[in-house]
Structure formats: structure tokens, C-alpha cells
From Swiss-Prot:
It comes from Methanosarcina acetivorans (strain ATCC 35395 / DSM 2834 / JCM 12185 / C2A). InterPro entries: Aldolase_TIM, DHquinase_I, Type-I_3-dehydroquinase. This is 3-dehydroquinate dehydratase. One of its GO terms (biological process) is 3,4-dihydroxybenzoate biosynthetic process. The lineage of its organism: Archaea, Methanobacteriati, Methanobacteriota, Stenosarchaea group, Methanomicrobia. Involved in the third step of the chorismate pathway, which leads to the biosynthesis of aromatic amino acids. Catalyzes the cis-dehydration of 3-dehydroquinate (DHQ) and introduces the first double bond of the aromatic ring to yield 3-dehydroshikimate.
Length: 242
């Protein structure tokens, strides 16, 4: 069984609201709009201190009752972390050891093996869910490359393997969905996203093919990645497609 906090991803896909500003205020708003999980983006919030991050996560969980996924995205993968790579991953390690800390962590496949393994080890030691991710903002790799990337994530001990790609055509989108379905049929837990305008519909359609997480914005004018839709709209459409 794959869970983030108490949310069972084998029963249904989760709508993840991305918290990128005014963390407590937007988290409450996301909960009101129907979010299942909150992703706290430390890099976008400009949080570099473990104590500050822990306090915010604690308050968010207390106020909303929702599970929290913590992410501290590197610049290379579309994030805004400024500073040493070791400090970026050590911040995640520190938070994962807390009893009332995050329920899950997202670490990039592109992180150094040493730093990535420290984050994964800390998460596993404290019963937290591990998402290993890869983001390509320029293209959609071939089906073989996407399959190999997801497989590498599972070898690295991902609970959830996540890829986000930029399609140049609807064929690219179909290839991503086909790869998603293939992993679902082998019992693997994946999250797949096609970004930008051609991939916008995958935000609500990919779960039908086996993607267990779909990322959404709280406001339509504040998105963390191209093509994100508002939480309440995603929830509504997903309910209609059930």
C-alpha cells in the first residue's frame, strides 16, 4: 500500500495543492477548495532554516488536518533554491526526523547519489513516503527513456516515481500516458505530468491511466509549473470522470 499520511493512493489519486506563498493562509484556502495533500515548496517560499520550516509545517498540519509533502527544488529541476546543494538536502533530512514533520518528501533523481540517499534513508527511517522526481522543461523523452527513468527511480527506493515532461505534440502526450498505464499494470506507483498547453488535460486525465498524484494551484494566476489548474476545478473534473 502506498500512502502519504493517512491518504491511501491505491484507492484514488490525490490532488496536491502547491504552497508557494503565504503558507498558512494559502494552505487553509487549499483545504477549503478540496485539496487532499499540500506540497510545501521551501525553495519558492524562501525558507532555508529548519526551525522556520518545521514551525510552518506544524502549523499547516494543525490548521488543515491534511498531509504535507515537502519539496526543496533545485534550480536545475525548475526550482529556486539558492545556496549549496548539501544545505538543500540537509534541510530535508532535518525535517524528516521530526515527529510532527512532513509525511512525504520529493527528491530529484538528478541530485548527487550521496545527497539523495541521505534524504531517502532519513525518510525510510521515520516512515515517510519517498517521491523521486525528474522534470524536463524542454521536451518529452522517448517512451524507452521515460520507462528507464521511472525504473531507475524504483531501483533508488522510490515509493512513488514522478516524471514531468514538456510535450511538443499530442503524440508525446499519448506516449507519456501509455508509459503510465504500463507501470500501473505492473503494480508500480507513478506520478506522470505533461506540462504546458498540450499537456494541460493530463492534469485530470493522467489519473485514469494510473498517475496517483496531480498537482494543482490554489489561484489560477499563481502556478508552480506550466499548465497547472486550480484545485477546485481539478477536483470537480476528476469527480465527473470517475
Amino acid at each position: 500500500m502506498t500512502q502519504i499520511g493517512p491518504f491511501d493512493l491505491e484507492k484514488k489519486a490525490a490532488v496536491v495543492a502547491v504552497i508557494l506563498e503565504k503558507p498558512l493562509e494559502t494552505s487553509k484556502k487549499a483545504a477549503e477548495k478540496g485539496a487532499d495533500i499540500l506540497e510545501v515548496r521551501l525553495d519558492l517560499l524562501g525558507i532555508r532554516n529548519p526551525e522556520s520550516a518545521a514551525k510552518i509545517i506544524r502549523e499547516i498540519k494543525s490548521e488543515t488536518g491534511l498531509p504535507v509533502l515537502v519539496t526543496n527544488r533545485s534550480v536545475a529541476e525548475g526550482g529556486k533554491w539558492e545556496g549549496k546543494e548539501v544545505d538543500r538536502t540537509e534541510l530535508l533530512v532535518a525535517l524528516l526526523s521530526l515527529k510532527d514533520g512532513p509525511d512525504a518528501v520529493d527528491i530529484e533523481l538528478s541530485a548527487s547519489r550521496e545527497d539523495r540517499d541521505k534524504v531517502i534513508k532519513a525518510a525510510k527511517a521515520h516512515g515517510k513516503t519517498v517521491i523521486i522526481s525528474s522534470h524536463d522543461f524542454s521536451k518529452t523523452p522517448s517512451p524507452q527513456e521515460m520507462t528507464a527513468t521511472l525504473a531507475e527511480m524504483f531501483l533508488a527506493e522510490a515509493d512513488i516515481a514522478k516524471i514531468a515532461v514538456m510535450p511538443g505534440s499530442m503524440e508525446d502526450v499519448l506516449n507519456l500516458l501509455k508509459v503510465t498505464l504500463e507501470f500501473k499494470n505492473t503494480g508500480k506507483t507513478v506520478c506522470t505530468i505533461a506540462m504546458g498547453k498540450p499537456g494541460k488535460h493530463t492534469r485530470v486525465v493522467a489519473p485514469l491511466y494510473g498517475s496517483v498524484l496531480t498537482y494543482a494551484s490554489i489561484e489560477s494566476n499563481a502556478v508552480a509549473a506550466p499548465g497547472q489548474l486550480p484545485v477546485d476545478e481539478v477536483k470537480k473534473i476528476m469527480e465527473m470522470l470517475k
